[in-house]
Amino acid sequence: MDKIRDKNGLTEEEFLEKYKEKNYPSPYLTADIVVIGLNGEQKKLLLIQRGGHPFINMWALPGGFSRQTETMEETAHRELLEETGVNSECISPIGLFSKPDRDPRGWVVTQAYLCKVNFTECKALAGDDAKNAEWFDLTVKNQIITLDNGDCVISFKYESGKIEYISKDKLAFDHAEIIAKAIELL
């Protein structure tokens, strides 16, 4: 049986031998997880404090880089467990976030996930590269999202796809945008 050839006369094997990855740069892939803690009417959001650069000491969503041997869902589960101690199978995709300048380390595309848990049953334990992991009270009023853990208050307005911080403290990366998108889906 003859091998199928493309318009350049190459078989698939020949094409793959000549294929140049550098002609098509690949982004780094990450998963970020918005963990909403519910207990009755009370809502909380689980954040980690970054232990390293970039954005050292800033609050962020749990998440991290994907390995070539895992799916994005597996990355989300692994990173959530490694950084916070939360082991939850209940995650659902929020969306893909791919602005070219969203991460100072380079072209990083993240698949964001939503995870809903009962926060009274999930103790936050910092691990891996997270310096700290804490539940923040979550309030949403007039398109203003406020996160408060008693020591730090992060407040921002989300309107027409844009984030405007009200507080001095901010979240790392584009995590305010990801949180706002998750809240829209609740």
Please name every model-derived segment.
Residues 97-109:
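Acidic pyrophosphate-coordinating catalytic loop
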Residues 41-86:
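Conserved Nudix-box catalytic region and its N-terminal flanking loop in Nudix hydrolases
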Residues 27, 89, 107-109:
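Residue-level preference for beta-strand/loop junctions
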Residues 1-32:
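Acidic, metal-coordinating catalytic segment for phosphate/diphosphate chemistry
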Residues 1-4, 56, 117-186:
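Nudix hydrolase/Nudix homology domain
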Residues 87-95:
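A short coil-to-beta-strand element that immediately follows conserved catalytic motifs
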